[in-house]
Swiss-Prot record:
<feature type="region of interest" description="Disordered">
    <location>
        <begin position="1"/>
        <end position="24"/>
    </location>
</feature>
<keyword id="KW-0697">Rotamase</keyword>
<feature type="domain" description="PPIase FKBP-type">
    <location>
        <begin position="24"/>
        <end position="120"/>
    </location>
</feature>
<comment type="function">
    <text>PPIases accelerate the folding of proteins. It catalyzes the cis-trans isomerization of proline imidic peptide bonds in oligopeptides.</text>
</comment>
<protein>
    <recommendedName>
        <fullName>FK506-binding protein 1B</fullName>
        <ecNumber>5.2.1.8</ecNumber>
    </recommendedName>
</protein>
<dbReference type="InterPro" id="IPR046357">
    <property type="entry name" value="PPIase_dom_sf"/>
</dbReference>
<dbReference type="GO" id="GO:0003755">
    <property type="term" value="F:peptidyl-prolyl cis-trans isomerase activity"/>
</dbReference>
<dbReference type="InterPro" id="IPR001179">
    <property type="entry name" value="PPIase_FKBP_dom"/>
</dbReference>
<dbReference type="InterPro" id="IPR050689">
    <property type="entry name" value="FKBP-type_PPIase"/>
</dbReference>
<comment type="similarity">
    <text>Belongs to the FKBP-type PPIase family. FKBP1 subfamily.</text>
</comment>
<keyword id="KW-0413">Isomerase</keyword>
<dbReference type="GO" id="GO:0005737">
    <property type="term" value="C:cytoplasm"/>
</dbReference>
<dbReference type="Pfam" id="PF00254">
    <property type="entry name" value="FKBP_C"/>
</dbReference>
Amino acid sequence: MNPPQGVTKTILRPGNGRDSPHTGDTVIIDYTGYLYDDTRGENEYFMGTQFDTSQGRGPLKTEIGVGKVILGWDKGVQQMTLGEKAILTISSDNGYGKRGFPGLIPPDSGLVLYVCSPAG
């Protein structure tokens, strides 16, 4: 159960089209993470079991492009602009790879992240 290689972004709500984060910038993002499930279908964005969410904790605040989060997160969020809402579909080599994340993400799992950048 793995999506196509790399990171694919599906825009649900466009951002302002100009303010994208750069390597080393701090971003603040609301998100929900799901395991990729090819039985769910394209209309459901292949969202399988939820493994994490910022809901109830507040948005994630992190530096982007410096290896503090998975590679697919870095790549996908750097493609977003301020105020954008998107689905990031991430292959396992851009996620947690062969090691997975014990107890949450099996080895070699693709991921689907629902991400929302603040409106600014």
